[in-house]
């Protein structure tokens, strides 16, 4: 007799670096015996970035970013921007591979006969971190250009129903304190990067809420102001108040408003080219599939307990009963291969 179908909860812990996501994910995995079924943790793919290939992607992107910072303002130098975008794509690759592998194990969403067993998959970041949020922060800093950002965003994967994104956040002063405390060679813990990254995640949460409420980027696009150099500089300014998730976001509160730039209108034309509109349509489709939960991070054990408390409200996806063992093996192999020196030796994350 075939094993009863499983109900799979997919949880993506995300947000700016230095918030304790990795530690929280391990705390969740340690809670595998908690009510609600086993928890499988997929850590950050640090080895893929740093040791699996001759070039270290983290060192590479830091060097490319420094090269861009040494240049003058305005559009990023094409060569420097291309190098930053190349390394950013390297960061995305293992997330996209893992995402595709897990998606292949999920069954269609029709109700399953019987089978109340639940398995929770916890991922240290969603592919959107590398395809959209970090690139968006780099775009605000003028490390990459609009064409680079769109190219990276276009690689964001289709999302099967049942994806739950937990955006971890902290008050700006506390986040800055933690980043300063954990700074080490190879970290991107400078004070200039976290403000636009924090804003990227706030805008992401607003965008998902806007789309989830039935909003459409095409409605009101023409009335939006231009996201010019001053607007991007404001998103990158650590002295600003920053953007925050809002209860009922409008189009102006979303990533789409920050993407309305003159670079998308070649030759100064008045109409958005269809290919760019299609790219924004595709991005909207992917973001609309996410259920977003906000988490004001505390100690990792408290965060893990909070995430477990959210689990009953999270979306689920059916999988064949036989997929349970496959998912467990996948989690073990991914953790073993992606953690330099073993799970206990890994850096805390980007």
UniProtKB/Swiss-Prot annotation:
Binding site for ATP: 15-22, 178
Active site (catalytic residues): 44 (proton acceptor)
Annotated keywords: ATP-binding, DNA synthesis, Early protein, Kinase, Nucleotide-binding, Transferase
Catalytic activity as recorded in UniProt: thymidine + ATP = dTMP + ADP + H(+)
GO MF annotation list: ATP binding; thymidine kinase activity
GO term, biological process aspect, one: TMP biosynthetic process
Short name of any one Pfam family annotated for the protein: Herpes_TK
Stretch forming the signal peptide: none
Binding, substrate: 88, 184
Subunit structure: Homodimer.
Similarity section: Belongs to the herpesviridae thymidine kinase family.
Role played: Catalyzes the transfer of the gamma-phospho group of ATP to thymidine to generate dTMP in the salvage pathway of pyrimidine synthesis. The dTMP serves as a substrate for DNA polymerase during viral DNA replication. Allows the virus to be reactivated and to grow in non-proliferative cells lacking a high concentration of phosphorylated nucleic acid precursors.
UniProt protein name: Thymidine kinase
Gene giving rise to this polypeptide: TK
